[in-house]
Amino acid sequence: MLQPKRTKFRKVQKGRNTGLAHRGSTVSFGSIAIKATERGRMTARQIEAARRTISRRIKRGGKIFIRVFPDKPITEKPLEVRMGNGKGNVEYWVCEIKPGKILYEIEGVNDELATQAFKLAAAKLPFKTTIVTRTVM
């Protein structure tokens, strides 16, 4: 599972996920990519599940580039614990996703196979996505 090796602070405030993705919004490494069209959170488990789905579909051909990393800790309090008494323990890690963010890229595979792999991976994600190709300028 993906998570940072070390962080400056153990717990972070909730914050708000607003705006559009400007960084990480273009296809940079591969030839075809999957892009988020809605905002949301992607847990480390979801990143890994989608990665496994893509790699199983494209088998040994091609290379997968993961463009997201879960760097935000999410805390939860145990069941049946009264309110107050501080913030809960870190339970899992998420990546805040804004519309327009590239999630995965594939290179070295024909576009039809990559599209099939991305459609299977999109079913594992908690927001709507679209498939985009690299534009050569």
UniProtKB/Swiss-Prot annotation:
Q: Name one GO cellular component term.
A: cytosolic large ribosomal subunit
Protein family per UniProt = Belongs to the universal ribosomal protein uL16 family.
Assembly, in brief, is: Part of the 50S ribosomal subunit.
Lineage of the species this protein comes from: Bacteria, Pseudomonadati, Pseudomonadota, Gammaproteobacteria, Moraxellales
Record's keyword terms, sorted: Ribonucleoprotein, Ribosomal protein, RNA-binding, rRNA-binding, tRNA-binding
* UniProt-listed Pfam families: Ribosomal_L16
The identity of this protein, by name, is Large ribosomal subunit protein uL16
* GO terms classed as biological process: translation
Gene Ontology MF terms in the entry: rRNA binding; structural constituent of ribosome; tRNA binding
InterPro entries with a match to the protein in the record: Ribosomal_uL16, Ribosomal_uL16_bact-type, Ribosomal_uL16_CS, Ribosomal_uL16_dom, Ribosomal_uL16_sf
Residues that span the membrane, as ranges? none
- Keyword Transmembrane on this protein? no
Tell me, what does this protein do in biology? Answer: Binds 23S rRNA and is also seen to make contacts with the A and possibly P site tRNAs.
